[in-house]
Amino acid sequence: MLAQATVQLGGHGVEVFDVPGLRRMRSIRLGEHGAVEVVFSRDGRTAYASQMETASVWVIDRRTYRVRRHLATRGVWSKVLALSADQRTLYVANWVSNDVSVIDLRSGRVRRLLPTVRTPRGLWPTPDGRRLYVAGFEDGELERIDLRSGRRKVLLRTGGAMRHLVGDPRRGRLYADDMAKSEAFVVDLASERVRRLAATDSTPNTIDLSPDGRVLYVSNRGRNGACYCAPGPEWGSVLAIDAASGRVLDATVGGNQTTGLDVSSDGRLLAFSDFLDNRLSLFAIPPYRVLAAGGGGRATAHRAELRKR
């Protein structure tokens, strides 16, 4: 992780920071609005940034920081992005139009719009290109779409608010978090059976796996106040959860609404953002064997620090 890209939801684009110093290197303006999500191509040369207000995706050259293309999604309120394993297709979840844009990256055109469960957010396409999993926020649904036939199946309905998805194809697992139920789930991809993995702190947001697939990191906003747009009565947090057993291995307290989260490709660094503080934090993280031998770290102790004094 030599640089960290951060979206400006209330700004005008994307900011780039160096690692580990977190010095702001560049601001990339994306028209008159901010960005929601950023994903990178496998070779790290291209960044894709979604923009809700314009229902579009900005394609950015990582070396020059210049915008290469601006792609329309044909959806409404475009948010989460996911690249296919062959890097030829970009999937975009459209929050208001309840569909996913399937964009051919060679032509830049929308190949088709896939209907989904209500308010789609998290996305995960399987490496074989046959299935797309969708997290439905409105009703707490986890949906699987057959990308050949378009057939859909809801695997889980919690009545909560399913938010983010991350897959482990080597072990045949898919992880999901529910923001309203404060829970993390795991799907066995062979049988498509779903089980509850762990309870999280209040209002979980983003999840990510360590590169070895053994630790699931979860950012948690903390309890909302009268409005999610203002600081609530709790600080946010980040949990490190054993991806197999669901045991919380460690925890740290964040700031006001801990949201964005990412683990570096070498598994040594964890970055997270505190949404209402306009702040990034960077942590060195130990390997699994150290976390597993740590007796739970601050998994219990941190809870006493969540409520603001």
Predicted regions and their residues:
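Predominantly soluble domains enriched in secretory-pathway, periplasmic, or organellar proteins
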Residues: 1-309
